[in-house]
Amino acid sequence: IEQFFPGAGDYAGASRWAGLRPMTPSNVPLIGHTRYRNLFLNTGHGTLGWTLACGSGRAAADLIGRRTPEVEFPFL
């Protein structure tokens, strides 16, 4: 990295890091109630997390509030 960005920082203390994104093997997010009364899932969006955030959040709020989501989600 130093050869591409000389003088950009102190590389001596640098370490490798990866910001992994949770996703399911099928690439379909998990949104819905679980067998645990106080646990609701809205995860597994992978690289589309920000893209799907508003729609998934709204669907999650509807489901938690026992309302039918506006959009039909086949993966709920």
Q: Predicted regions: what is each one?
A:
Residues 2-76:
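C-terminal catalytic lobe of FAD-dependent flavoproteins
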